[in-house]
Amino acid sequence: ALAVLSKGPVGALVPGLVIFLFLLTQKKWAELLHMRLLIGIPIFLLIAAPWFLYMYHLHGKDFVIVLLGVHNFLRATQPEHPENNVFYFYPAIVLVAFLPWTGFVLHGLWKGILDAWKEKAPIPRFLIIWIASYYLFYSLMATKYPTYLFPIWFPSALLAAIYLPWVPKKFRFFEYILPISIWWVALMVGAYLFVPKPLSWFVIGLFLTAGIFHLSFISKGPKGRFLPGVVLLTISCYLIAS
């Protein structure tokens, strides 16, 4: 009901699509009886309906035209920000938004897709359907905003957590990977903000390369094995950047 108040009909449409597709794949329509729809629907209307009725009372058909026409139909068919209307916009958002956990999220998504259709894996199936429904729905819309993908953060994080034990041990050094990733990302952000263009892109490339080597060194050997080389590489990057 709150989603409908803030986003309009789409606030019920996409969650309803997720539930429908999940029940369709599970072939357990009897679950609808356990959703207490006879109680839920009146509560939904009690929360959402008064505002819509009041707005219609104040503005008449203009409210319907603006709500459905401008904020739903036009956004779906006409891009408000044409520069964002590219195929790689949402993939880039996903990769950046989950830093420094992107690798674990991608691993969880991959394992979840593989397990989604197993008979005894309803939770991964539900989470994958949840993510896919929102992602595909908003990818097909002409207007693209980073905030449109917010509903997939929660199921993506759950998948990453569920399949974390299946991540190879050499990639599970959280005490090293997390601070190191944050460190190198912070350096790249700082280079982008404070180093003059186009030199900043060169510095970002150096920091990115150094960060990748740093993490790969840690994953291949015990703590401190390649520390001297990493320190020298870091100092070199600082000298070049300065």
Task: Enumerate the predicted regions with their spans.
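Redox- and metal-dependent alpha/beta enzyme cores, enriched for Fe-S-associated oxidoreductases
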Residues: 196-199, 240-242
